[in-house]
Amino acid sequence: MNMSSSSRKLSRLFNIVTQNQKSPVLLSSDQEAARRITACLVEKSTIGKLQSNPSLLFNLNSNVTRLVLSEPTLPTQSCIDFFKLLREFESNLKPDLTAVVTLSHRLYSNRRFNEMRSLLNSVVNDGFYKRPVEELGSAMVDCDISEEKFEFFEKFFDLVFRVYVDNGMFEEGLRVFDYMVKKGLSIDERSCIVFLVAAKKRRRIDLCLEIFRRMVDSGVKITVYSLTIVVEGLCRRGEVEKSKKLIKEFSVKGIKPEAYTYNTIINAYVKQRDFSGVEGVLKVMKKDGVVYNKVTYTLLMELSVKNGKMSDAEKLFDEMRERGIESDVHVYTSLISWNCRKGNMKRAFLLFDELTEKGLSPSSYTYGALIDGVCKVGEMGAAEILMNEMQSKGVNITQVVFNTLIDGYCRKGMVDEASMIYDVMEQKGFQADVFTCNTIASCFNRLKRYDEAKQWLFRMMEGGVKLSTVSYTNLIDVYCKEGNVEEAKRLFVEMSSKGVQPNAITYNVMIYAYCKQGKIKEARKLRANMEANGMDPDSYTYTSLIHGECIADNVDEAMRLFSEMGLKGLDQNSVTYTVMISGLSKAGKSDEAFGLYDEMKRKGYTIDNKVYTALIGSMHSPET
């Protein structure tokens, strides 16, 4: 039987005795009670001995518990077991603050610091740490531990401080810090760094600054590491100039920043695409003799790529190697990814080969970048080879990689292959996300396989995936193409009621459907609604409306819209011209139609048979 189940059994037994024993056996003194309990605990079966004599526990109180835990003849492990046993009870037998301090002191004396920290962590939910920190100091006195034992005091409060931080109790941690300063206890900078790191992870930059200020004011040793954490926190918050001032302030005090300190500021500037800001930092680094490290080079390469200077990124990569700084998988993956985005697949594969020749193992991100690159250029065979290689080498295929493959197949119109990849993804335990379903449904839609497109979107809803704007637009488009504009309209209204807002594409789909059916009034209303919601009609919107007005024989209104497009700087493409020429020709306005035909030729548009047929027809149509 394990310790926990034995403790629970004893707890139940004690409760039974409590209810049924009218006159428990009370011993003459706390010392006698402690001696009797200690005698039980030195036996091999600690819990078993107490189970045979549970009435002993009636004599327990705070002082007896303290005497037992501080008894030098009792093995420390027995003390730990006894403490754990008492924590199982739901009565006043539970260990109090003096018990925690006593056992902590014992563990400290035995140099069992990890167990001491575990003990303090284990009682975090027992309510002790919600009390004022001064009560911890009072408990020391109650346990006959004098403040002269500075070493224990410092270790104890240092661990309590860390426990607060581990459990996200930052305000309480600050109070412990202040108490230690007040009592003249030295504070370990490493513990303060633990606080800084934890607060930064939770994006509590205010707390980082607060503890750092206390560290400076109380004379805690400040190192470049703690300074860098605060600098990074400020940069995350967008306060780059403040972080630079902090670096300057501590440089004067002899805390010289390292490359990784400056990297945090460079990273902030890179995200802002602030090239001059980066140049300023590099000048300071050069002046102070701070040498670039791997991260510095990687950030500078990233900035070069963002500024469209891939050749500069390659030069930095070469410079890094010339200086003997070894590139890791992250550096290679970044370069491979950037080259893939630029369509430089040959260079990307050369870098991949170089990576493997150096004995580095490509990560899922490395393969993902290459797969994304080959998918974008339509080389799905290469994508399959890379995926198979990932599997053979035991590299995890992430959902991002699966989605990339699905997107690649759908771009090529290979929707059945995309569906098979989806099945493999499901077998691997991945849940379909909105991107996956939208990609496949859109492909079915483009291929005019409308029933399958709808099935995918319905399947998405049944699987609990919330429809996005793209999902609704897809479904609305399918119904419009099937001629079911009423159902499309119902979905259009439904999406807004469910908090999914239509975008310009959604409006364009509905406007086109109404125009095609000759419902020009409804199309006009949608345009007005679109503009009221802050969306400007684009070339597609205008072309649809022009087509609708022409169908409704409102060719003058269509021409007005055509002119309005030009005034707004919208692209009057070949489709727009063809629609307008057809409308004018049908209305017998051959001069205007031929005028637009001449414009088309001047702009270099390809003129198809529809235009010629319309122009010929215009010469035989009476002008309206």
Swiss-Prot record:
Q: Which positions does the entry assign to PPR repeats?
A: 153-187, 188-222, 223-257, 258-292, 293-327, 328-362, 363-397, 398-432, 433-467, 468-502, 503-537, 538-572, 573-607
Keyword Repeat listed: yes
Write out the entry's keywords from A to Z. Answer: Repeat
Annotated PROSITE patterns:
PPR
SUPFAM superfamilies recorded: HCP-like (SSF81901)
- What PANTHER family does the record point to? OS03G0856100 PROTEIN, PENTACOTRIPEPTIDE-REPEAT REGION OF PRORP DOMAIN-CONTAINING PROTEIN
Per the similarity annotation, which family is this?
Belongs to the PPR family. P subfamily.
Q: What is the recorded name of this protein?
A: Pentatricopeptide repeat-containing protein At2g32630
Species of origin reads Arabidopsis thaliana
